[in-house]
Every structure is written in C-alpha cells, then in structure tokens.
C-alpha cells in the first residue's frame, strides 16, 4: 500500500487549474495602500495567502464567518476536499486505510508519518498496553456523575482531567512529552469510554485485560461481566 504519488513533495509548485501562479506573492490594494502578502503553495488542493502580517502592515483584519476560506495551520497529516469526497491521511486515501490497515496501524501512521513495520507495530502495541490502566482516583471521578448522564460529556470531562494525574508530560514544546501524552490518550480512551458506558447502565467497571489487543480489550471492558 502506497500513498498518493507526490504527496508531501513541496517542490512541485507551478500553476493551479485556475491559472494562478503558485510561486508569486499576492498584492492587496486597500484604498491607496498596496500590501504584499506571501503565497503558500499546497502540495495538493488549494494554495493559501499568508495574512498573518496583514494587521501590522495595513491595520485591517480579515472577516471570514465560519472560517470557510481560512486554514488555521499547515498540515502534513490530513487532506480534505468535501465537495470531491476526498479524505487522505498522510497521503493515503481513507478507503485504502479502512480496507487494509488496523486501528493501531492508522494511529501509528498519524503520529509518526508512515505505516509501521511488523516489529514497529508490535512495539507500539506493547507500549500502549503499559498505559491502559487509569489512576484509581480518576476512576472514582466517574462517581460524581449522575447515572443518566450522556457518556460523551462524561468521557470529555475525564479526558480533561487526565492531565491533573499525569503531570510529567505537559510541555507541548517537548516532543517526548507530546509523544507520551499521545500514547497515554490512545491507551486510556478505551478504558474511559468503557467506564462511561458502564456508569450509564449501572454496572461495575472492569479493569483492562492486557492479554487482549486494544480492540478486544475495549469490547471486554464495555460489554463483559465480572
């Protein structure tokens, strides 16, 4: 399985299908003032105009209700074209990933930028298994919710609370911290989701059983009985 040819090739810049020069800056005229803005080429899809300096240069801001024409950041992870029905992760069509890759393989792809080898996947799965348990105090956190609370806000609240129990990986500028927090979230979300469901139906929580893989473990914690 291979990504779409050319994905991630930032050197392939020319003209788009509207004939716009993808290498040129953009000149914006506001009254008598002309402001030059940078053009940010896209590896696929539409290019963008860099308006980050617009306020300083021209004293104005952009207005784009709903951010219909605004990209919040550049991304090498996801490409979406809703009108054309296209969704790609790291260059791979979502249909291809759904048919040929497991949940953990796609998770690895999103985090590290490439599909894992068999050894890398095994190591990744083992690492996730070391983080499936919840701190016991976080487990008791669920007791504060009414039984008829919808599982989604319960899950969202528990996820927000995780950082108060795991304060050794909170620096967003430290790649090691980001990686550890990502692994923890992947490992603990199935446990949190299962606990939220068990709370809603009045059944006792089940601890993770790491003899199972991630998906089997989630099903066990969600639907199993003591």
Placement of each model-derived feature along the sequence:
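Short, Lys/Arg-enriched N-terminal segments with co-localized hydrophobic residues
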Residues: 6-21
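Hydrophobic alpha-helical bundle cores within soluble ligand-binding/oligomerization subdomains
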Residues: 23-226
